[in-house]
């Protein structure tokens, strides 16, 4: 019987069960738990390779007569998902993941689950890593250029609010009122990015809130700059319960209308999505972080404080003054800014992520956050925590699968769950929309190799278009065919609430995109979130700002050196 070494097998077909991959220049190692492809029957495309007519490709079945034939197969790829780290072929049809297993020709190959046909295209995944597209639930739609910056970082869904560079958009993730919501839905219709908008959750009666939901808002945002009072929070949640949408909250830093206990009482056990729950981005000073222990709170971080480094505190003051329209010549404004920037709570934030207490990472784009760094900074936290805290339970020095799955969940499945869109996006599984990101391991988390939306390549590393092959320098991220023409109408999604779809908003506005409903939000608890659902008792000392979890002091050292940083951006 023929045999080959692991090294030779990995060079031809990619790694297999038991092999390990280092993720870029981090100290994290992913070990392949299972190989769903069949040894000796691997589907590989190219000259003299397997996927040829009569061999690995079936030559007589049509797409119409065989509903299992995919439009695209990604071969021999390492899937890195909250659900597992494994090797498989991925079949995609009509923009949906239809098969995860072994691809080939059922007439000539045994054990295949994904038939390759005449209508099938091949993307070579050998030696590469595949993740679900990232989801950022904290977007200030200030500049349309954010969309490309997010896309080339691996983000395929952006949820938030705004109207452009207005003062209130620079401060709050809110698209206020039906007219602005409709104009933004029209504006965003042609971009290769899934979109959901948040309306303004600030009213004294239900009607103005309901108007925004009927207009297309998939959530309401409550923000202190508009007045995050207990009454405002309570009313927004009451309306959200009626229409099955999310409420996102940035609480009252100044404690003008009440303290964290007042907000907890106003929430009243109802599910809510808290933004920058550590507090530097805003929220009850100094103890908003305590809400992360509540079973009904879905806590997120924004990326400026992730990970905690020697530069974190210093950069925040100027950033905060700009984002919240504060005046450095006014002592009260400076005091407001100072109250939000606390070394002790920032130092606890990374540890809370590592313990699975903080559940989601997001950007706060151009409003104290960097839209293209959600994924980078998530993995920088994971690396920093491994270096400081050692392996998670069940991991070893050479295998970090539990930590890796916990962290990938923070920007994929968990934000999808929080916004009621996990039935469509957020993970690599059959039946989900094929928003997928392909990575070379040496660039994992920092520079994707290829981004697919709805099964179509929308952006990729590409060399000089006038060259004889695709790879000559300069290799840059460039929009691909899926970003042009009317392709985005099928490869990108606008998420709407049920009531807006029933009211015919897509038809009224002439939207050409795929429309999907958000739902299942109001029954969520923190336990619904994958691998990040811990609910301990969290206490902040009101004088020292020290954070304790079930009585134990929680802190970490600021990082002086990070992976996924300068060496990847020299040119």
Curated annotation (Swiss-Prot):
Active site per UniProt: 324 (proton donor)
Cofactor note: Binds 2 nickel ions per subunit.
A cellular component term, taken from the record's GO annotations: cytoplasm
GO BP terms: urea catabolic process
Keywords associated with the record: Cytoplasm, Hydrolase, Metal-binding, Nickel
Residues in Urease domain copies: 133-571
Pathway: Nitrogen metabolism; urea degradation; CO(2) and NH(3) from urea (urease route): step 1/1
Principal location listed in the UniProt entry: cytoplasm
EC number: 3.5.1.5
UniProt PTM comment: Carboxylation allows a single lysine to coordinate two nickel ions.
Residues binding substrate, per UniProt: 223
CDD domains, A to Z: Urease_alpha (cd00375)
Annotated positions binding Ni(2+) 1: 138, 140, 221, 364
Cell compartment(s), UniProt: Cytoplasm
Coiled coil: none
Binding site for Ni(2+) 2: 221, 250, 276
GO molecular function: nickel cation binding; urease activity
PANTHER family: UREASE (PTHR43440:SF1)
NCBIfam families: PRK13207.1 (NF009686), urease_alph (TIGR01792)
Protein name: Urease subunit alpha
